[in-house]
């Protein structure tokens, strides 16, 4: 399997990247965290599978937790690239970083989330920046189908209030723009027991990450152009 990888910032707290440990969200101040990180991979760039439709997953450590499962479930049907980071959409560098990946390949589907690193950001400001992101995606990738993935609930019901607020604001942005598919990961995860399925305040254990991967993969395959089947690879 061929791949290219761009590591923009090494994270000493690596567990925050892989989705199993603490995440420095609590250090968020003015939309910026004490430790910012960004990781990306693009698979099958030169091998015999390079001409399959390409999908871009954009998110944070939650996305990093399910991206491997998505790649396995969609293997042979599409190529999956992903960019995961700690950056809030309100950061000036966010659009510049996103633009780099949008210019890298032609994508059939772009599955997008931003939110858990924005829980201390003013919601109207975040929603405005999110709208700018979707406009950039459409400008750079006019043929791509866009999926908005809702941010997932936190272990704390009290702290999840802000997540729901951001999701509601995002829903309004999506409705106003039109033509964007919604993948409601919040509703998928919300019924599960927090003590049993959450590994910390933000992240999920493997069995729950697999459920996320299955829903993401199903959503992607259902809108993938010329997809021979929406069935997941077993």
Q: Which residue ranges define each predicted feature?
A:
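Bacterial N-terminal signal peptides that target proteins for export
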Residues: 1-6
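Bacterial N-terminal signal peptides
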Residues: 8-15
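Boundary at the C-terminal end of the N-terminal hydrophobic targeting segment
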Residues: 15-21
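Conserved SGNH/GDSL esterase-like catalytic core that processes O-acyl groups on lipids
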Residues: 23-132, 155-157, 161-164, 203
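Conserved beta-strand segments of alpha/beta enzyme cores
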Residues: 79-81, 145, 179-181
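Glycine-rich phosphate-binding loop signature in dinucleotide/nucleotide-binding domains
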Residues: 103-105, 140-141, 223
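Active-site segments of SGNH/GDSL-like serine hydrolases
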Residues: 111-117, 134-168, 189-192
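Catalytic His-Asp segment of secreted/periplasmic serine-dependent ester chemistry enzymes
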Residues: 153-234
């Amino acid at each position: 399997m061929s791949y290219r990888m761009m590591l923009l910032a090494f994270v000493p707290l690596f567990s925050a990247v892989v989705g199993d440990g603490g995440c420095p969200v609590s250090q968020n101040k003015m939309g910026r965290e004490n430790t910012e990180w960004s990781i990306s991979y693009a698979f099958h760039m030169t091998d015999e599978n390079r001409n399959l439709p390409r999908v871009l997953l954009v998110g944070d450590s939650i996305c990093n937790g399910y991206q491997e499962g998505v790649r396995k479930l969609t293997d042979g049907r599409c190529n999956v690239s992903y960019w995961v980071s700690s950056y809030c959409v309100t950061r000036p560098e966010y659009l510049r970083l996103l633009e780099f990946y949008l210019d890298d390949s032609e994508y059939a589907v772009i599955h997008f989330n931003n939110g858990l690193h924005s829980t201390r950001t003013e919601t109207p400001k975040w929603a405005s920046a999110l709208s700018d992101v979707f406009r950039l995606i459409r400008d750079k990738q006019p043929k791509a189908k866009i999926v908005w993935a809702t941010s997932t609930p936190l272990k704390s019901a009290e702290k999840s209030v802000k997540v729901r607020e951001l999701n509601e604001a995002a829903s309004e942005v999506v409705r106003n723009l039109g033509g964007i598919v919604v993948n409601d990961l919040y509703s998928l995860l919300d019924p599960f027991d927090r003590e049993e399925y959450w590994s910390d305040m933000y992240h999920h254990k493997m069995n729950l990450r697999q459920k996320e991967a299955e829903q993401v993969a199903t959503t992607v395959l259902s809108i993938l152009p010329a997809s021979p089947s929406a069935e997941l690879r077993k």
